[in-house]
């Protein structure tokens, strides 16, 4: 009987009330979608938005990306005021564009401009998947083509960070046309001996992966990035085969010779610096007048 008096009580975890949960401001904590670890957002930002537990690369917005690779204060933006219209009068498209402008503080899904990496001048374009899933419409294509032409004029390398769901369906054939336009601009840059570095981040799919994203002299990618044209389910239904678990990942593409390297975000700036150093003088072997 005495033994019954000293039975250990079961331990219960205290579940915070809804009011306590509400007292935690939004954005203070971030949950990793891969390992489910919850961490302070400010610590995640200090680590370039890479999970300290599992190494998952969280998406970066355009400005975070530029800050991580360019010399401080060196960036000068191109074509900032360029915005998309609704040439096909697609229902609801203008409202969606306006909502994304307010949400992201961007006018379109790509930011272009020039800056330096270890004092070496480059022209850079960074796609931002928060704006229409980084889809490529007429303005995205035009901004990228103009940036490539600027690199050609300045005789400096062109670097792009891609993150896109592909061509923008609301612009129909006008969006598909950007695949050819950007590719032609890059061909001109290449013919003159210009250096082009493409860095594919998660996700790079559809018409973007099938055009300028895959045309680099160096094709790099971040770990775990989804890279491909059609979706996994569509391919499986077409070929009637089960695809490997790592199909369309950066690591799978590297193993099959479609990438030059998979580069951790911590090492990205230094990797770019080394490539640029090898191609000093802008990588321009022979310039055509």
From Swiss-Prot:
Subcellular location: Cytoplasm
Pathway assigned to this chain's UniProt record: Lipid metabolism; malonyl-CoA biosynthesis; malonyl-CoA from acetyl-CoA: step 1/1
Binding site for Zn(2+): 32, 35, 51, 54
Keywords tagged on the record: ATP-binding, Cytoplasm, Fatty acid biosynthesis, Fatty acid metabolism, Lipid biosynthesis, Lipid metabolism, Metal-binding, Nucleotide-binding, Transferase, Zinc, Zinc-finger
One example GO MF annotation: acetyl-CoA carboxylase activity
EC number annotated for this UniProt entry: 2.1.3.15
Classification via InterPro entries: AcCoA_carboxyl_beta, Acetyl_CoA_COase_Trfase_b_su, ClpP/crotonase-like_dom_sf, COA_CT_N, Znf-ACC
Cofactor note (record): Binds 1 zinc ion per subunit.
Start and end residues, zinc fingers (C4-type): 32-54
GO CC annotation, single: acetyl-CoA carboxylase complex
Cofactor needs: Zn(2+)
Residues in CoA carboxyltransferase N-terminal domain copies: 28-289
Family annotation (NCBIfam families): accD
Function comment: Component of the acetyl coenzyme A carboxylase (ACC) complex. Biotin carboxylase (BC) catalyzes the carboxylation of biotin on its carrier protein (BCCP) and then the CO(2) group is transferred by the transcarboxylase to acetyl-CoA to form malonyl-CoA.
Assembly description: Acetyl-CoA carboxylase is a heterohexamer composed of biotin carboxyl carrier protein (AccB), biotin carboxylase (AccC) and two subunits each of ACCase subunit alpha (AccA) and ACCase subunit beta (AccD).
Family (UniProt): Belongs to the AccD/PCCB family.
Protein name in the entry: Acetyl-coenzyme A carboxylase carboxyl transferase subunit beta
Organism: Bacillus mycoides (strain KBAB4)
